[in-house]
């Protein structure tokens, strides 16, 4: 008789295995290890934003009303950046600025750093969530890689740019009109629209929108009508073995339209991934350059000629003058502590400009 010796299959699970089983269990909303970062950070970031836009003024940091309580609406409310005098302080509630006083912390702009950092880590948690789920179901990680692009833009605009400047004050506030103002600031002080990295970003985003529209329309146009259902959702079984649209027909169509067309689905879809992700990454790199005050294209010869010849003007020289007007108006408004004084003749004339 043979006796088999070995460990019992019913070994006691350690704490890590128990936590892993619970976190990665198949449920309606997947939690996962990434959820330990994502859910708390997203909760606090959104909660801080809703609290700030509802109740908190920007009077002490920007001299502005910025909450629903003060009469703002969804487009004009914001969680505004801390004052310039606070530089790059983390503005912790228990720090030397607020000293545990929640009201003072809100007045100083503490909610902005709270929302910015929790929001940044929340986005990273969401990317890790995509990695984790992809690994669990044996998918490639391209979704997570693609999501790195908006994370790069967020981190560069909200964190790296103000770190390169004198303080968080120069980051965008979290609000619709506030971000519009930040865009105008970027144009006036950095000539952002003439920056090659911005140009690549625009090409990426608009090119991706065009590709998405073309791709969706082409697939709709070449669907196989192999079912008797009244619409696409009834006509096709999600587990069917055959493809639902004709790549050959699509290729022939676009070959006739443009003379060239994608003949490979992998290359087509990789290109749709590559265009927007690369565009957003280029924009993020450009903003890092602005943090270091790197300049955009300068056509100095045109500026010199325009200064010498009143009859010579280009769209570029007109834009340069417009940027000077933006700087003259915004600097005095946004930085009253600097006591900037500009001659009356260079300032805009009221609502009529």
Curated annotation (Swiss-Prot):
* Binding residue positions for chlorophyll a ChlzD2: 118
Q: Which residues bind a plastoquinone?
A: 215, 262
Q: Where does pheophytin a bind?
A: 130, 143
Q: Where does chlorophyll a PD2 bind?
A: 198
Note the CDD domains from the entry.
Photosystem-II_D2 (cd09288)
Q: Which UniProt keywords apply?
A: Acetylation, Chlorophyll, Chloroplast, Chromophore, Electron transport, Iron, Magnesium, Membrane, Metal-binding, Oxidoreductase, Phosphoprotein, Photosynthesis, Photosystem II, Plastid, Thylakoid, Transmembrane, Transmembrane helix, Transport
Task: Give an example GO biological process.
Answer: photosynthetic electron transport in photosystem II
Known catalytic reactions: 2 a plastoquinone + 4 hnu + 2 H2O = 2 a plastoquinol + O2
Domain of life, per lineage: Eukaryota
Give compartment(s): Plastid, Chloroplast thylakoid membrane
**UniProt: Fe cation binding residues:** 215, 269
Q: Which GO terms describe its molecular function?
A: chlorophyll binding; electron transporter, transferring electrons within the cyclic electron transport pathway of photosynthesis activity; iron ion binding; oxygen evolving activity
Modification Phosphothreonine occurs at = 2
The residues that cross the membrane are: 41-61, 125-141, 153-166, 208-228, 279-295
Could you name the Gene Ontology cellular component terms for this entry? chloroplast thylakoid membrane; photosystem II
PTM annotation (N-acetylthreonine): residues: 2
List its EC numbers: 1.10.3.9
Q: Which Gene3D superfamilies match?
A: Photosystem II protein D1-like (1.20.85.10)
Give the similarity note: Belongs to the reaction center PufL/M/PsbA/D family.
Primary role: Photosystem II (PSII) is a light-driven water:plastoquinone oxidoreductase that uses light energy to abstract electrons from H(2)O, generating O(2) and a proton gradient subsequently used for ATP formation. It consists of a core antenna complex that captures photons, and an electron transfer chain that converts photonic excitation into a charge separation. The D1/D2 (PsbA/PsbD) reaction center heterodimer binds P680, the primary electron donor of PSII as well as several subsequent electron acceptors. D2 is needed for assembly of a stable PSII complex.
Q: Which HAMAP family match?
A: PSII_PsbD_D2 (MF_01383)
**Quaternary structure and interacting proteins, as annotated:** PSII is composed of 1 copy each of membrane proteins PsbA, PsbB, PsbC, PsbD, PsbE, PsbF, PsbH, PsbI, PsbJ, PsbK, PsbL, PsbM, PsbT, PsbX, PsbY, PsbZ, Psb30/Ycf12, at least 3 peripheral proteins of the oxygen-evolving complex and a large number of cofactors. It forms dimeric complexes.
Protein name as it appears in the record: Photosystem II D2 protein
Organism of origin: Cycas taitungensis (Prince sago)
Q: Which gene encodes it?
A: psbD
């Amino acid at each position: 008789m043979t006796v088999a010796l070995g460990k019992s299959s019913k070994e006691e699970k350690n704490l890590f295995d128990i936590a892993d089983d619970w976190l990665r269990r198949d449920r309606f909303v997947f939690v996962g290890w990434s959820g330990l970062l994502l859910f708390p950070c997203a909760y606090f970031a959104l909660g801080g934003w809703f609290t700030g836009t509802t109740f908190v003024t920007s009077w002490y940091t920007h001299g502005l009303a910025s909450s629903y309580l003060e009469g703002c609406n969804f487009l004009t409310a914001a969680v505004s950046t801390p004052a310039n005098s606070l530089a790059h302080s983390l503005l912790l509630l228990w720090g030397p600025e607020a000293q545990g006083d929640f009201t003072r912390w809100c007045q100083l702009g503490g909610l902005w750093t709270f929302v910015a950092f929790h929001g940044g880590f929340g986005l990273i948690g969401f990317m890790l969530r995509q990695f984790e789920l992809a690994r669990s179901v044996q998918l490639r990680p391209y979704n997570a890689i693609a999501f790195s692009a908006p994370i790069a833009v967020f981190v560069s605009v909200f964190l790296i740019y103000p770190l390169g400047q004198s303080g968080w004050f120069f980051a965008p506030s979290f609000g619709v009109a506030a971000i519009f103002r930040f865009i105008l600031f970027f144009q006036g002080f950095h000539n952002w629209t003439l920056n090659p990295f911005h140009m690549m970003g625009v090409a990426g985003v608009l090119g991706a929108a065009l590709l998405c529209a073309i791709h969706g329309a082409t697939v709709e146009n070449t669907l196989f009508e192999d079912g008797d259902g009244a619409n696409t959702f009834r006509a096709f079984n999600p587990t069917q073995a055959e493809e639902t649209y004709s790549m050959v027909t699509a290729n022939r169509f676009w070959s006739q339209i443009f003379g060239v067309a994608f003949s490979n689905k992998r290359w087509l879809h990789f290109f749709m991934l590559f265009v927007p992700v690369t565009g957003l990454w280029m924009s993020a790199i450009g903003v890092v350059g602005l943090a270091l005050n790197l300049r955009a294209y300068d056509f100095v010869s045109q500026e010199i000629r325009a200064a010498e010849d009143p009859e010579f003007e280009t769209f570029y020289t007109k834009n340069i003058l417009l940027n000077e007007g933006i700087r003259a108006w915004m600097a005095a408004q946004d930085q009253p502590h600097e006591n900037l004084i500009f001659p009356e003749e260079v300032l805009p004339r009221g609502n009529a400009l």
